[in-house]
UniProtKB/Swiss-Prot annotation:
Protein name in the entry: GTPase HflX
Chief place where the protein resides: cytoplasm
Record organism: Saccharolobus solfataricus (strain ATCC 35092 / DSM 1617 / JCM 11322 / P2) (Sulfolobus solfataricus)
Keywords: Cytoplasm, GTP-binding, Magnesium, Metal-binding, Nucleotide-binding
Assembly notes: Monomer. Associates with the 50S ribosomal subunit. Does not associate with 70S ribosomes.
Amino acid sequence: MKTAALFVSKEFEEEAIALVEGANYKVTSIYKLPKSPNVKFYIQYDKLQQIKNDEEISTLIIFEQLKPRHFINIRRELKGKEVLDKILLLLEIFALHAGSKEAKMQIELARLKYELPIIKETYTKSKIGEQQGPLGAGTYGVESTIKFYKRRINKLMKELESIKIFKEKSIESNKRNNIPSIGIVGYTNSGKTSLFNSLTGLTQKVDTKLFTTMSPKRYAIPINNRKIMLVDTVGFIRGIPPQIVDAFFVTLSEAKYSDALILVIDSTFSENLLIETLQSSFEILREIGVSGKPILVTLNKIDKINGDLYKKLDLVEKLSKELYSPIFDVIPISALKRTNLELLRDKIYQLATQLS
């Protein structure tokens, strides 16, 4: 297993460690991010030298978005060590869990579009003699790399557009067959996949590591002799970078093109975190074009809740209705223990009937 030094702010330390471990790295040391980033390296130079001289560390991970100059300067210092920021870390995790050709294409597109400005700045520096190129290739090598990236990006965008058109036609076909589709959305580890499994009887992989659902899974279930299509979508992340939202449009659009949504919220969160989660969830849905379709909010993991369930339920219901319309209903459940699952099935049937 590769070893990593991790730079992260205290408030995101737990999430960052889970992400790094989810990418199959062993965190050997943790450093706080500087309050005032170093202009040249982002992190403190003395800390960079510690990592440079530590032979046990193979990778430096900075849980923030770096500028191209930071990558160039850090990589020049840490020759032989891998350097990742938050976005490259997320893309590496996505690549590990990609289950379809489409997902792999989306990940490659996101990575190429993110790395291209770094290579362009490397080219600029190589022309004035500051940098020898990404692999010591010099100006000509960097020019060739830039041309390759641009060609590959254009090809991937065309292929993904074709997939998008095909999916839209497939969705329209389902609508003509009077099969309503309901997307299950929410943050990673909120219990989306557990709920999908409980409702469908399937056994998708459920993992404590983040991002186990990369390609949306679709499955039709019968409720009161009515066929309803359920879709388990890719999970949200906090502070999701716009580059990833754009690159994963086709995957995230499963939510946009669903007739209705089930938003899964983790009831074990504190009230402040519940508020933050609801606000960011509805913001992400707006960003991908969700508007006007009914949303059924589920407060999940009530078997593990600490505190007053009804107080949290009241908070979630009130805030959800302030942030979005129409909210079909808000109900407490435990996907794992199957608490209130029959009630949820009834609500899904009512929702599907309303859509007809």
